[in-house]
Amino acid sequence: MNNQEYYDRLGVSKDASQDEIKKAYRRMSKKYHPDINKEPGAEEKYKEIQEAYDTLGDEQKRAAYDQYGPAGANGGFGDGSGFSGFDSSGFGGFEDIFSSFFGGGASRNPNAPRQGDDLQYRVNLQFEEAVFGTEKEVHYNREASCHTCNGSGAKPGTSPVTCSKCHGSGVINMDTQTPLGMMRRQVTCDVCHGTGQEIKEPCPTCHGTGHEKQSHKVSVKIPAGVETGQQIRLAGQGEAGFNGGPYGDLFVIINVLKSDKFERDGSTIYYSMDINFVQAALGDTVEVPTVHGNVELAIPAGTQTGKTFRLKGKGAPRLRGNGQGDQHVTVNVVTPTKLNDAQKEALQDFAKASGINPVHPKKKGFFNKVKDAFDEM
């Protein structure tokens, strides 16, 4: 076995954080838990996951594993003589010895309360909903505390008992013959699966897990000014905890749908509109849509294509509460594609009055004239 296999068992990279390792362990152990997964090989897979987490979940063991592989994580190297090192089985383990002298220990209490897993939910918002804020009711399934046994995993009227194999420690000693000699290591108890307790009579609803899948709904207040990718954390709306631990959190991920009128970057809203060349040349007052309603915009004479105007305060709210953004309006001067004789003559007169050389457009052939005639029908 190389020093990558434990990471592969949990589905994480070698540079994963302890939080990522813990979440991966919870997800994988739940998937292959023998009380839930009855497929052949599930129990063996569960044991492999437990073995990997026993090492990677401990910083010191993980460091030794990364450097020396499993032999380093499981207690060091022998001299080849078969000597297995100090047998701590009669003393409750090194952690218990240090705990009795110094009031602490490095081992994890298998019965300690643990927070449940976090969940994610993606919610779609209309453009205006993201600008002004809204309230959404989201529906999803989550692992909740079993309503029959209240999360104990035991049949009502019964209680879990101390594991008969590990005596409540959650781990057992295992001797392994290696090329370096006999080695003793601690592994997760295969009877209680690390909880330190046995359930003699499992709950008929959750089959001993203490959890059941339930439909859940919660109302989410979306603040004004949110953008795609931002998250809203709802504490305690995730999955049920373990050993009486609190529920995890729900992270609502925002996805803002595109508008057929506007574009947005932060608190600034962008809008493009067409004006004709007469408006551009002589100036005009036009009506412009905004998310706050229509407003009038003065187009000065001589406006060119690409000119951008700012409508102050007509953008989106700034999420941190610092007022409103602006709306930028970019104009596109549209050149007419078809002119009648009067319009052509007027433009020719304009060209002469402006000192512009006479325009001599290419005369149309017979087929182009026929095509124009059909277009006008």
Swiss-Prot record:
Q: Which Gene3D superfamilies match?
A: 6.20.20.10, DnaJ domain, Urease metallochaperone UreE, N-terminal domain
Pfam family for this entry, one: DnaJ_C
Q: Which cofactor does it need?
A: Zn(2+)
Residues in CR-type zinc fingers run 133-215
Mark the CXXCXGXG motif repeats by their residue spans: 146-153, 163-170, 189-196, 203-210
Which amino acid positions bind Zn(2+) 2, per UniProt?
Answer: 163, 166, 189, 192
Q: Which domain of life is it from?
A: Bacteria
Any one Gene Ontology biological process term? protein refolding
Task: Recite the UniProt keywords alphabetically.
Answer: Chaperone, Cytoplasm, DNA replication, Metal-binding, Repeat, Stress response, Zinc, Zinc-finger
Q: Which GO terms describe its cellular component?
A: cytoplasm
* Cofactor binding summary note: Binds 2 Zn(2+) ions per monomer.
Family the entry assigns = Belongs to the DnaJ family.
UniProt free text on domains: The J domain is necessary and sufficient to stimulate DnaK ATPase activity. Zinc center 1 plays an important role in the autonomous, DnaK-independent chaperone activity of DnaJ. Zinc center 2 is essential for interaction with DnaK and for DnaJ activity.
Name by which UniProt lists this protein: Chaperone protein DnaJ
Taxonomic lineage of the native organism: Bacteria, Bacillati, Bacillota, Bacilli, Lactobacillales
